[in-house]
């Protein structure tokens, strides 16, 4: 695996104050399955936070599957994203989706957030 395709701690939102900043001042992107809160950051790379609640997915196995897919798609697209903080929240409809549909939905969001010059 290439060094720039990992998922180090530096590209995650880890502290409550980081989440508060995003929830307090963010623009929203949504579809039938997900809501993304996006806020510009002062760093040089995008950072990801997850807020997958029991309201969205009742069973822990479903919440973990959703989180795993979000982390994986973010990791694959991170180098093309603008320097933003992103918090991903899901909607109850997503629990009935298969992995391919979840990936497709998330990839549309990452494409919207990608920097114009990152795609040659």
UniProtKB/Swiss-Prot annotation:
SUPFAM superfamilies: Ribosomal protein S5 domain 2-like. GO terms for molecular function: 3'-tRNA processing endoribonuclease activity; ribonuclease P activity; tRNA binding. Its EC number is 3.1.26.5. It comes from the Bacteria. Gene3D superfamilies: 3.30.230.10. Pfam families: Ribonuclease_P. GO terms for cellular component: ribonuclease P complex. The keyword ATP-binding does not apply. InterPro entries: Ribosomal_Su5_D2-typ_SF, Ribsml_uS5_D2-typ_fold_subgr, RNase_P. Keywords: Endonuclease, Hydrolase, Nuclease, RNA-binding, tRNA processing. It is an enzyme of class 3 (hydrolase). It catalyses: Endonucleolytic cleavage of RNA, removing 5'-extranucleotides from tRNA precursor. One of its GO terms (biological process) is tRNA 5'-leader removal. RNaseP catalyzes the removal of the 5'-leader sequence from pre-tRNA to produce the mature 5'-terminus. It can also cleave other RNA substrates such as 4.5S RNA. The protein component plays an auxiliary but essential role in vivo by binding to the 5'-leader sequence and broadening the substrate specificity of the ribozyme. Belongs to the RnpA family. Consists of a catalytic RNA component (M1 or rnpB) and a protein subunit. This is Ribonuclease P protein component.
């Amino acid at each position: 695996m290439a060094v720039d395709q990992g998922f180090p701690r530096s590209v995650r939102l880890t502290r409550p104050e980081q989440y508060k900043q995003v929830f307090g001042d963010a623009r929203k992107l949504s579809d039938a399955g997900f809501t993304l809160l996006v806020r510009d950051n002062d760093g040089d790379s995008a950072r990801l936070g997850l807020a997958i609640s029991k309201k969205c997915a009742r069973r822990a196995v479903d919440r973990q599957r959703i989180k795993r897919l979000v982390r994986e798609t973010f990791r694959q697209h991170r180098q093309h994203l603008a320097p933003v903080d992103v918090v991903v929240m899901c909607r109850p409809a997503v629990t009935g989706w298969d992995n391919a549909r979840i990936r497709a939905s998330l990839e549309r969001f990452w494409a919207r957030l990608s920097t114009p010059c990152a795609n040659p």
